[in-house]
Amino acid sequence: MILTENLNVLWASVLFETLYRLGLRTVVLSPGSRSGPLAIAAAAHPHLEALPILDERSAAFFALGLVQQQGRPVALLCTSGTAAANFYPAIIEASLSHLPLIVLSADRPPELRFCQAGQAIDQVHLYGHAVRHYRELSLPELPLLPYLRQTLCHSWQTALWPDPGPVHLNIPLRDPLDLRSQANFHGELPKGFFDQVQPFVPPRVVTSLPWQTWQQMQRGLIIAGPSHGVDPLAEAAAIDRLSRFLQWPVLADALSSARGLPHGISHYDLLLRDAHLREYLRPEAVIQLGPLPTSKALREWLSACDPLIWCLDPTGDNNNPLHGRCQMLAIAPQAVDCPPDPLPPNPYLKDWQDQDQRVREQLKRTFEAIDWFSEVKLIYHLPQWLPSQTAIFVASSMPVRDVESVWQGSDRRHRFYFNRGANGIDGTLSTALGVAHRGQPTLLITGDLACLHDTNGWLITPQFQGCLTVLLINNRGGGIFEHLPIRQFDPPFEAFFATPQQVDFSYLAAAYGIPYHCLKDWADVEAQLRQTPWPKIRLLEFRSDRHRNAQWRQQVLAHLGG
């Protein structure tokens, strides 16, 4: 449907029709005047879902969640001025996580900039190097509609290939900014105007791999970082084929699709805290898939061992924070074609599996003896208690580290989502809502500070269609700081690092009309989590003692691997 009341709405209509034909299905927009024609066109398009969200920062992270869930670009629209600046944190996350995002910022025309006209800032290259591509569109003109179409096609392609990420289109508009008819205006498109607008298909890149070298290695590892791919099952199957052929163990981040594979080692983070095992399990070669896992113990061990590393990653990122002996190979795991016949069984693989099983049994005995509200025990039991195919969004900071340490793979096909590009806590709730919107029933695991940092996310509730359970681990402060050397210095530790908040979450939930439940004991925790999915949104509060949990991690968990 092309609107033709005036030049601006025609321009905006052509913009969204072009993006729709390229593959766009969702537009997330925040209200404003200068973006009026664009909002009108998005809302009027019969095949686009247009979602109005008040707060721009929350809207941008919600869009990131949608991109992760849908596996395709989402458009993000705002008016001129500081509105666009509020998109910046999410754009940084999209850039570092290789998530394609189409950022559309309306702007004042050139004659209303730098003259105190109001609601005008310098939006040219506003996001700097965080975007893959920037274009300022011309002011709307009928003869320039083919230029608009081609600019959009190129921008869409750049968002997807060769390195997926955000692109920014700055769109200046003069009045009228509404549906008023324009005198003597006849906006008709030529026949077949959209005929060549087709979804972009990235080319397949073939990279030769050092199979002969790998087959000669007796102590090889596959290390899989967090999965940013849109098809985790295909990625997991590819990693499984590679590990079965080479007979190498797989050390997979809990946020990877490969955690729980037959050759997978779930508890490497605990094993590598033991000095004897660090030497006993020393590798000579590593195939690294994407970025390194979160585990500090793993990173320190690899740095000390200095094995030969081949990093497989199609994005071209420098995934070598240890500055080791690493060769970069621009290929995704799914594109690896393994030779047909697997190698003989490898004693190095069995060593890893035996140690992993020993720790698995030790964890089971340890948690059976705990009756107090242990945050790590909560994470340990989630794979058993959550229904099959639950999507899980894990907040940064302490939750993701506990997941890394004790999450055991299962056959329930849980899929993880996360914001691990910049590793910030901002936008946690909003991103989780985006993941759950019209998607799988979702569980958000978050601490109290991450949840409070994004309370405007609750404003999305009226537009939200889906099932989200927020599992709030409330230890009244930043639990991760308890594990840093600064903990020994109080003051200033408690006030300036732990930053405890005194919010009653039952009142916060009531203010937004969110069902709330404070978990009472372990039987209650299990019963509530087995009820997932829950209609719409609910908040479960797990109250824990920050100091006791930190002390237990340091005195007990850290020594379970030995």
Swiss-Prot record:
Q: In which pathway does it act?
A: Quinol/quinone metabolism; 1,4-dihydroxy-2-naphthoate biosynthesis; 1,4-dihydroxy-2-naphthoate from chorismate: step 2/7; Cofactor biosynthesis; phylloquinone biosynthesis
Q: Which domain of life is it from?
A: Bacteria
Molecular functions per Gene Ontology:
2-succinyl-5-enolpyruvyl-6-hydroxy-3-cyclohexene-1-carboxylic-acid synthase activity; magnesium ion binding; manganese ion binding; thiamine pyrophosphate binding
Q: Does the keyword Magnesium apply?
A: yes
Tell me one GO biological process term.
Answer: menaquinone biosynthetic process
- Entry EC no(s): 2.2.1.9
Q: How is the cofactor bound?
A: Binds 1 thiamine pyrophosphate per subunit.
Q: Which protein family is named in the record?
A: Belongs to the TPP enzyme family. MenD subfamily.
Name of protein? 2-succinyl-5-enolpyruvyl-6-hydroxy-3-cyclohexene-1-carboxylate synthase
Origin species: Thermosynechococcus vestitus (strain NIES-2133 / IAM M-273 / BP-1)
